Amino acid sequence: MTKLSGAAADARLGQAWETVFSQDSAAQQIIHVLTWPTEYPAWLTGFPPFEAWGRNGDEADEAVWRTFAEITIPWPYIRSARRATALGIPNTRIFVLKRSQWQSAPSWLRYLAQVHLPAIAALAGEKLYRVWLEDCRSAGLQDRDYDVNLFGAGGIMLAGYHNGDVDWRVFLADDGDQDLSGREHDFINSMRDFAVARGELVKLPPELHPGSEF
């Protein structure tokens, strides 16, 4: 697989989005399956919303949401996802967590699950589901130690991590491995069906819903 990082990965992701926008919106869907985090994300150090949340006793209030919106609304993903939402393209994010570790989860993981991802989903127009790894395994779904993302006609992108942050991306349409592409398509569609049937649809912060001042 050809792994891209940095500006090359960002440029290729931009091409995938443009492919989505160039096709019939009614035939498009976007799905993200996020693997369970195992490392503290280095980018959280000094990230203002995370620090504001910590100062507020690990609780999100209007100031936390406002800080988050001010920082993230300019992000390319938020802009592209909002454009997709305006075109009626469904966007689903599925976050995998280990039930056995959740009650003793570190603060950074609770921030990701309870603040960061719900805020991204609200601003981007996503549906956000939380699923337990143990339930996925019981249902016969195989583990992934990387993210699997479907960008409609733009194809599937895999994303791997180092020090808790995305380190590389692979665009399967570029590699021509039909077997791998087929397996990942099956996986992401199975995870979507599983999340709808047995996952938790996460309530998103109303402060960031469409129609809010953000």
Model-derived segments and their meaning:
Residues 97-144:
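HKD-type phospholipase D/PLD-like phosphodiesterase module
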Residues 81, 88-94, 114-117, 130, ...:
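Extended, compositionally biased low-complexity polar/Lys-Gly-rich tracts
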Residues 5, 106, 125, 199-200:
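Intrinsically disordered, low-complexity coil/linker segments enriched for acidic/polar
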